[in-house]
Amino acid sequence: MAHGLPTAQDMAPASSLGSALDSETIQDPSQEPAQPPGQEPAAPPAIALTIGGSDSGGGAGIQADLKTFMALKVHGCSALSCVTAQNTRGVSRVDALPPEALTAQIEAVLSDLPVAALKTGMLLNRGLIEAAARALAPLAIPKLIDPVMVSRAGAMLLEPEAIQAYRDLLLPLAELIT
């Protein structure tokens, strides 16, 4: 233990986890692996942005989008619009983030990463839809718009007064609507 804190080796069992945490097998992410002679370096993965709600059960929302991106070997970024308390039996709570928080997340990703495509999901209210539309309108990348309205268990995930904003502001930006 260094400085009274346990190290990974102190805490790891003498199993495959312990050997996986061996300092000799952990590669410094700042060090690029050596390319075999004559082999081209692998292209970096495409980057996609998902904008939507968080599902605490992990079965929908941005969690599902990020799992899909990973399966497709796409680097996934996210911007949260809402946080839900839900599981396989239903949704017990939905909290919308302020539109300014959504805008800040989208701008943070777009200012640093070359996003090649994006997907929207749950945008609970008119303010979130307007914020997303303002951020997405100038982007010349494919946009998949998924107007999430109701959960699988029947909970409303789009306020009725926001439906027209979806039609007017987001759907015209879409290359694909689900």
Annotate each predicted stretch with a short phrase:
Residues 120, 124-178:
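Conserved beta-alpha-beta core of the PfkB/ribokinase-like small-molecule kinase fold
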Residues 1-117:
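Small-residue (G/A/S/T)-rich helix-start motifs and N-terminal tracts that mark the onset
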